[in-house]
C-alpha cells in the first residue's frame, strides 16, 4: 500500500539545482535510509515532503488519514513548559477528544431524552477511541520513553528553556516517538544522543512496524535499521534494496559500468566524427558521411559518472608548544550551580584526549572553562606556554548572511580570491556552494566552511566540540585521517566511538566526575 507518491519533483535555490524530476512511492512499513553527500538536498527534500517548503515543480501526495511525524530541529519549545508537558503534547489530539467527551457528559444533564441517546452514543465512540489509543496509560508511556532517552535524569518538571541543544533534541525526538505516526521522518537523530540512547533508538527502529525515512551519516546505525536506501546524487534519487553496505557494492559496480559505457561511446563518437570530416566533401562517400552525421545527431549521450568532491583536511601546524597543555587545580565547572566535582586534570604535549559522557553534564562547559571563555565556579585552570589554539565550536556563531568567500576573507584578508576559492574547494565545496550565502548551506557544508578556517590557521592545540556532527561519510573519514597525522595536541568532545577509535590516546569520561544524576 502506497502512503506517499512523489511525482516529477524539481527544486533549486537560485541557479543551483538540488534535484531534478524526482519520482517515487513510499510503501507502508518501508524502512528507508536517505543518503547523499553534504549539500545534495536531503534536508530540503524532507522539508518539501512535509509541506514546509514548496517545490519549484512536481507534486507530493499523501494517502488519506496518514499521520506524519517529523523531528524538526528548529521547533519551538515554549519557556515555562516542563519536559513532561512537552512530551504530553504528543497526545494533544487525544486530550482534545477527552475534552469533547467531557463536554458531552456535562451537556447531558440538561438535554432532552431524544438528544440524550445521540449524545451518549457519541460519547461512547469517543471513549472507545481513547481506550484504543491507551489514553489512560499516557503517563506510563511518557515515563518509558523519557527513561530510554535519558530525560528522567534531568527531571521531567524541568523548564525546557533550561535545556542544552542536545537535551532539547532528545525532548523533540521523544515527543515524536510517543506520537507513533504512520511515518517517521528523522533528520540525523543520533547527532545529540549518547551511546546508550543511540542503542535504544536502534532497537526501537528495528522493531518499528510503521514506515520511516532516516537521514544519518552514522553508517553502523544506518545498517542496523534500514532495508532500503534512497541515494541523492547528481540531482537524482535512486532506490537500492538492502542496507548501506549493500548499496555501496551495487553503486560501485554501477559507476564502473557507466564509466566503461561512457568511454566506449566517446571512442565511437571520435571515430564517427573522423569519418565525417574525411568523407563529407567526396562525392563517392558523401552519403555515408551524412548517414554517420545523422547517427551522431541522434545519439543519446551517456554522461560520465560524477562523484561529490573529496575533501582534504590538512592542518597547518605552528611551532611546538610547551610540555604542559592544561593543568587544573580543584576546578569546579558550571554556571548557576556546580556541574562537576573538583577536578585535577593534566594534559601534556602530543596527547589526543576525547571527552565523552551524557548530554548536559558539562562537556562543552569543561572545554570553555579550560580555555578561559567562561569563569569556573571555583578552582583554577591554567594553560601552558606557547599555545597556538585552533577551536571548533559545536554550532556556528555567525548570522550566515555572508557568502562563503567573504566568510573566509574576513579571517584571511591577505589572500587573493583564487586562494580563498582553492581553500574552500579543498574542503569539498563546489563553486555553487562557495558563491552561496552561508545560511543557505546544509549543516555539513557549514561545518566544512568552519573547518576551512580551522585547518588554515597554524596551531599546536586543537579543541574540537563534536566536529563530526552533520559531516558526511567522506568528510568524517578524511577528518579522522588528518587528526591522526596532526603532530600537535587534541582535546575533543565526540559521541562517535567509530570516529575516535585509533585516534584517541586517552578518554575522559565526564560522567565519572559530574555532580548530576545520570
What is the role of each PLM region?
Residues 250-305:
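Intracellular alpha-helical coupling/juxtamembrane segments of multi-pass membrane proteins
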Residues 1-260, 309, 318-518:
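ABC ATP-binding cassette signature C-motif
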Residues 313-315:
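Post-kinase regulatory C-tail/linker adjacent to protein kinase catalytic domains
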Amino acid at each position: 500500500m502506497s502512503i506517499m507518491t512523489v511525482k516529477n519533483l524539481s527544486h533549486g535555490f537560485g541557479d543551483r539545482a538540488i534535484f531534478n524530476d524526482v519520482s517515487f512511492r513510499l510503501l507502508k512499513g518501508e524502512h528507508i535510509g536517505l543518503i547523499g553527500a553534504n549539500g545534495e538536498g536531503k534536508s530540503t527534500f524532507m522539508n518539501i515532503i512535509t509541506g514546509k517548503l514548496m517545490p519549484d515543480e512536481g507534486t507530493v501526495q499523501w494517502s488519506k488519514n496518514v499521520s506524519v511525524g517529523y523531528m524538526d530541529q528548529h521547533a519551538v519549545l515554549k519557556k515555562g513548559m516542563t519536559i513532561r508537558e512537552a512530551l504530553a503534547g504528543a497526545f494533544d489530539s487525544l486530550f482534545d477528544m477527552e475534552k469533547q467527551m467531557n463536554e458531552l457528559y456535562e451537556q447531558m444533564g440538561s438535554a432532552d431524552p431524544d438528544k440524550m441517546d445521540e449524545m451518549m452514543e457519541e460519547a461512547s465512540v469517543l471513549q472507545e477511541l481513547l481506550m484504543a489509543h491507551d489514553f489512560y496509560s499516557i503517563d506510563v508511556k511518557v515515563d518509558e520513553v523519557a527513561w530510554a532517552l535519558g530525560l528522567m535524569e534531568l527531571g521531567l518538571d524541568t523548564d525546557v528553556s533550561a535545556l542544552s541543544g542536545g537535551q532539547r533534541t532528545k525532548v523533540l525526538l521523544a515527543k515524536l516517538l510517543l506520537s507513533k505516526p504512520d511515518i517517521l521522518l528523522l533528520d540525523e537523530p543520533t547527532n545529540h544522543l549518547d551511546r546508550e540512547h543511540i542503542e535504544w533508538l536502534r532497537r526501537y527502529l528495528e522493531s518499528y512496524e510503521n514506515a520511516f525515512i532516516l537521514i544519518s551519516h552514522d553508517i553502523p546505525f544506518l545498517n542496523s535499521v534500514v532495508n532500503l536506501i534512497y541515494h541523492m546524487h547528481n540531482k537524482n534519487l535512486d532506490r537500492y534494496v538492502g542496507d548501506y553496505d549493500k548499496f555501496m557494492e551495487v553503486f560501485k559496480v554501477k559507476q564502473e559500468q557507466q564509466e566503461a559505457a561512457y568511454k566506449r561511446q566517446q571512442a565511437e563518437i571520435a571515430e564517427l566524427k573522423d569519418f565525417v570530416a574525411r568523407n563529407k566533401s567526396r562525392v563517392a562517400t558523401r552519403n555515408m558521411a551524412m548517414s554517420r552525421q545523422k547517427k551522431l545527431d541522434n545519439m543519446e549521450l551517456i554522461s560520465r559518472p560524477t562523484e561529490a568532491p573529496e575533501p582534504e583536511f590538512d592542518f597547518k601546524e605552528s611551532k611546538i608548544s610547551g610540555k604542559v597543555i592544561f593543568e587544573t587545580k580543584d576546578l569546579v565547572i558550571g554556571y548557576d550551580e556546580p556541574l562537576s566535582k573538583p577536578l585535577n586534570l593534566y594534559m601534556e604535549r602530543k596527547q589526543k584526549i576525547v571527552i565523552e559522557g551524557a548530554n548536559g553534564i558539562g562537556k562543552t562547559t569543561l572545554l570553555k572553562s579550560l580555555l578561559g571563555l567562561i569563569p569556573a565556579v571555583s578552582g583554577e585552570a591554567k594553560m601552558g606556554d606557547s599555545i597556538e589554539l585552533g577551536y571548533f565550536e559545536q554550532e556556528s556563531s555567525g548570522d550566515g548572511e555572508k557568502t562563503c568567500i567573504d566568510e573566509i576573507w574576513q579571517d584571511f584578508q591577505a589572500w587573493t580570491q583564487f586562494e580563498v576559492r582553492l581553500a574552500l574547494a579543498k574542503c569539498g565545496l563546489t563553486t555553487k556552494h562557495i558563491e552561496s550565502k552561508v545560511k543557505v548551506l546544509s549543516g555539513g557544508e557549514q561545518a566544512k566552511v568552519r573547518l576551512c578556517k580551522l585547518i588554515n590557521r597554524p596551531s599546536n592545540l586543537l579543541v574540537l566540540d563534536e566536529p563530526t556532527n552533520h559531516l558526511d561519510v567522506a568528510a568524517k573519514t578524511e577528518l579522522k585521517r588528518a587528526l591522526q597525522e596532526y603532530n600537535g595536541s587534541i582535546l575533543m568532545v565526540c559521541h562517535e566511538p567509530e570516529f575516535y577509535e585509533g585516534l584517541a590516546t586517552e578518554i575522559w569520561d565526564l560522567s565519572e566526575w559530574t555532580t548530576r544524576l545520570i
